[in-house]
Amino acid sequence: MNPNQKIITIGSISIAIGIISLMLQIGNIISIWASHSIQTGSQNHTGICNQRIITYENSTWVNHTYVNINNTNVVAGKDKTSVTLAGNSSLCSISGWAIYTKDNSIRIGSKGDVFVMREPFISCSHLECRTFFLTQGALLNDKHSNGTVKDRSPYRALMSCPLGEAPSPYNSKFESVAWSASACHDGMGWLTIGISGPDNGAVAVLKYNGIITETIKSWKKRILRTQESECVCVNGSCFTIMTDGPSNGAASYKIFKIEKGKVIKSIELNAPNSHYEECSCYPDTGTVMCVCRDNWHGSNRPWVSFNQNLDYQIGYICSGVFGDNPRPKDGEGSCNPVTVDGADGVKGFSYKYGNGVWIGRTKSNRLRKGFEMIWDPNGWTDTDSDFSVKQDVVAITDWSGYSGSFVQHPELTGLDCIRPCFWVELVRGRPRENTTIWTSGSSISFCGVNSDTANWSWPDGAELPFTIDK
């Protein structure tokens, strides 16, 4: 074999070996790809271990956790199927209240990015509960927190965050521009109601799944306002109460029936001797019960109950265990307004059980300090001040504030009844603590149980003043 033939032979062998090697590499790549596809079930999630991803599907927050194990991604999540929250069940039988959440917003906000806010409340879908709140468009320990004692400003907004977390720009979702608000879930989407604008011309903006669906203009031009707690959804319809008119005299009160964000019916209450503000409402066997604030002349709380056709009944809690603040010492109650210390008030709630009533109230008669739950077995209808259970929640030496009801439907809990719950706002700063330039709050919440509970104090606990205040 001459030299040229040797060169040609060696070159041919090298080319053949190269082609075989290339084919083997291609086969290896195909094999790896096929194996990976089988392992992951054709899912394409990549990333580090324990990566938490939150998606917003069908207007309900759904949590997924992807765990990467040897290149195999396993996904766990909740069923996102929409339901209709019926609200037809009765309230669960309870013997006390178990601590549910505490967000420690003010304590965390001394060092972290936490919103200045007030009027927090909680509402639950069939998948989760969320904290809603009215921010002041400012952060704690920042110059824009100055002057946030003001209730109504163009910087206020309704936002929401995961339950039990301090509300920050990193975990909160914008809902509506608002200085008065409500929100609830019908099983298919969130309804939000945000009121903003001038005192003599405010407008309520209704959104369903984040889209504006309706507006309601102030009809008395006297500070249109709503619940500052959750609205109520029953069989696909949601209900809320709004007030327009004086805070120290007879005003106008309307109930609205809303479906998928559209008002389909409304009525005005005929209640010339009653005053309804900041109602705390809940469903019970297909009807809606609201317990409200009388800022005009009652130290006991007014109530209104109505069915899905908006046929309603009104009254006052008769018990001599008075629920408002300020209020007189417990004594002889009335099924009409108790006018002693009846002026002014604070948002609150109660739960009716037959002739009995769970009353939530501040421990102080004069200041928004402390909080307690009292069971009066005949208090809905009888006027004496006898009660059988008192559970301490916040000590009288610590600040409280607004409080309100929320419920957990059977579709969420798996129970055969509606679980009653409540939240308490723990206000810090001005006007009572003048060492600060700001006003804000944290919150705690409790749910009713038929088992052991604790008597204790769960105060805000922040040490004031902050750096910005000095």
Curated annotation (Swiss-Prot):
Positions of region (Hypervariable stalk region): 36-90
Record has Transmembrane helix as a keyword: yes
Record note on modification: N-glycosylated.
Segments in the Virion surface topological domain: 28-470
Gene Ontology molecular function, alphabetical: exo-alpha-sialidase activity; metal ion binding
Enzyme class: hydrolase
Top-level lineage group: Viruses
Positions of substrate binding: 118, 152, 277-278, 293, 368
Topological domain ranges for the Intravirion compartment: 1-6
Glycosylation site residues: 44, 58, 63, 70, 88, 146, 235, 434, 455
Subcellular location: Virion membrane; Host apical cell membrane
Activity-regulation annotation: Inhibited by the neuraminidase inhibitors zanamivir (Relenza) and oseltamivir (Tamiflu). These drugs interfere with the release of progeny virus from infected cells and are effective against all influenza strains. Resistance to neuraminidase inhibitors is quite rare.
TM region positions: 7-27
Location of the active site: 151 (proton donor/acceptor), 402 (nucleophile)
GO biological process terms on file: carbohydrate metabolic process; viral budding from plasma membrane
Required cofactor(s): Ca(2+)
Span list, region Involved in apical transport and lipid raft association: 11-33
Region (Head of neuraminidase): 91-470
Reactions performed catalytically: Hydrolysis of alpha-(2->3)-, alpha-(2->6)-, alpha-(2->8)- glycosidic linkages of terminal sialic acid residues in oligosaccharides, glycoproteins, glycolipids, colominic acid and synthetic substrates
Binding annotation for Ca(2+): 294, 298, 324
Membrane topology designation: Single-pass type II membrane protein
Residues in coiled coil: none
Stated family: Belongs to the glycosyl hydrolase 34 family.
Entry comment, domain topic: Intact N-terminus is essential for virion morphogenesis. Possesses two apical sorting signals, one in the ectodomain, which is likely to be a glycan, and the other in the transmembrane domain. The transmembrane domain also plays a role in lipid raft association.
Additional record remark: The influenza A genome consist of 8 RNA segments. Genetic variation of hemagglutinin and/or neuraminidase genes results in the emergence of new influenza strains. The mechanism of variation can be the result of point mutations or the result of genetic reassortment between segments of two different strains.
Protein name: Neuraminidase
Taxonomic placement: Viruses, Riboviria, Orthornavirae, Negarnaviricota, Polyploviricotina
Gene: NA
